Structure formats: structure tokens, C-alpha cells
Amino acid sequence: MPIYFSKKILLGFTTGLCLQICTLSANANSTFTVRSLGLQKCEQLVGAMQGETESQAVVLYSQWMAGYLTAKNASLGVLDVFPIRDPLGEWVRFVTLVCAGNMNKTLAEVLEGSVSALADYRETDASAETLELVDGEHKIRVYKNYLIRMQQHLNGRGFKVDSIGRFDESTKRAFLEYKKSNNIVGPALPDSLFLVFVLSQGKTQ
């Protein structure tokens, strides 16, 4: 079954979602079990992530999705299927956003569909260069190829970027203007919200 990348879903989310990757141990008395998380419906994941405080469910979901990403990279023989290297919470946020548009599907279905949708963004070069992108207090580390692709996407939609492959002021300004024009919240970075929006539009340049 196909999954959907919804533009409208982004309007209901903010960067304040409780999506930290945690290293806490799971409580042995939890009603959640790691084996069953993939069978949980997306509505359960989204509900947990929209909580005001970090819960044990959030910890387990985050750890499970982190493990899934590591295993998928290994099984496909690629460096990374997700173009945002750090923080890992961006991967969790990405999956949660996709789940929000596919509430009746299982987490496993959405993860598999997301990996397929991200096929063009996979990094296969073990020595691929990464760049730290900073906007105020916000920062992410991405693969350079991903930044280039997103800069080309911006240029193709009339948001001028001067230096392809560098995160200069023209790039930051273009990301900010693009997000504002499309009602996407968050810093002037190609973060998970930006990526979901781009995927919702189909193929990029």
C-alpha cells in the first residue's frame, strides 16, 4: 500500500514536538514491547509524540526507529538512507510527520514506504562529505549531496542561491523565504519538515 506525503499535515506541527532521541533504559513493566512497535498504528505514535512531556513510549519509539535505520543501512549496503546525519531526532520527526498523514497504517509500513520514497537521497559513498548547517540556536549535519540537491530545488522555484554546495547567506535566506511562502515552521534549514514538504511535491530537480 502506498504512503502519502501531505503538505497540510505540516501546518499542524511545530518544532516543539517531543522528539528527542534518548538513551534511557526501558522499564521492564512497560505495556510496550520492542517487538510489537512496528505493528503499532501511526495514530499511536503521533499521539505519543504530541505529548507535552517525554514519555516512556517516546523513548521506546525513538530507540526502535533508530535501530531500524541502522539495520536498514546495513541490509541495503549504503552509508545512509536518510540524508540528515544529525541529530538523529530529525529521523524520528520525519517518520512522525509521515505517520501523521497515514494514521491507519502501521509504523512498519510507513518506515518501509519512507525508505522507498527516500531512494534518490541515499548516500552510498562511505567517504561522503557532511556539512554542519547552523541557523541561530538550531543546527543539523547533512550530507553535502543533499544540500546541493535542496539548493537546486530552491533555484528551480525562483529562490536564488549563489553558491551551490556552500551554506552561505544566500542559501539561508532562500530557505527562510521558501519556508515562509509555504507556511513551514522552523529555522532556515533543510530539516525534516522541509524534506517532507519537498517529497509531497514529487520529484525534485
PLM features: residue spans?
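N-terminal secretory signal peptides that target proteins for export/translocation
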Residues: 1-6
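Hydrophobic alpha-helical segments, especially transmembrane helices
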Residues: 8-9, 21, 180
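Bacterial N-terminal signal peptides
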Residues: 12-22
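Cell-envelope/ECM-targeting effectors and their regulatory/trafficking segments
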Residues: 27-205
